[in-house]
């Protein structure tokens, strides 16, 4: 299996800054939990833990429960097999490679030039993996998530590495006067 660095570097130029950070955090979570492989639940937990990311608000907009997604992802990571006595090398699991490929495909189908966190969440909803079941259990479906992404993007594509960073800025730094 390929080392983490190789798979992530291969796609680095196509990832938004936020998604790159989430992948790094997923790797840190796998290391901290003594997991041999980085799995989709690590990445799901990483995006849910990002206070400045858009995952929680996107899930909420899609009618889901972000706290439940986060709690269930944490529980799933806690249940993963632990390996002790390794050199601290973690590898990308097959499921995560599959999801990253699906994520890239979702982004390309939408005309995005960069792969974003929201495309990862969307790709997950189309799989039979535990991370997908966590989203479904919290009320997130592919159809609802697609509608939420469309509403957040306002028809725009992700055209640069900072594409998802500025989206919630207006909401964050303004007061709703209605």
Give the residues covered by each predicted segment.
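Histone-fold recognition with a strong bias for associated Lys/Arg-rich disordered tails
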Residues: 1-178
């Amino acid at each position: 299996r390929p080392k983490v660095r190789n798979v992530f570097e291969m796609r680095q130029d196509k990832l938004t800054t936020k998604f790159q950070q989430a992948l790094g955090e997923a790797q840190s979570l796998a290391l901290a939990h003594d997991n041999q492989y980085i799995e989709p639940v690590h990445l799901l937990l990483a995006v849910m833990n990002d206070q400045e990311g858009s995952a929680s608000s996107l899930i909420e907009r899609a009618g889901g429960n972000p706290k439940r997604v986060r709690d269930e992802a944490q529980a799933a990571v806690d249940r993963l097999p632990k390996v002790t006595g390794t050199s601290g090398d973690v590898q990308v699991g097959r499921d995560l490679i599959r999801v990253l490929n699906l994520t890239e495909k979702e982004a390309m189908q939408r005309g995005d030039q960069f792969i974003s966190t929201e495309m990862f969440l969307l790709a997950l909803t189309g799989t039979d993996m535990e991370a997908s079941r966590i989203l479904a259990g919290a009320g997130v479906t592919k159809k609802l998530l697609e509608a939420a992404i469309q509403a957040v993007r306002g028809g725009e594509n992700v055209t640069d590495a900072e594409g998802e960073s500025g989206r919630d800025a207006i909401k964050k730094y303004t007061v709703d006067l209605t």
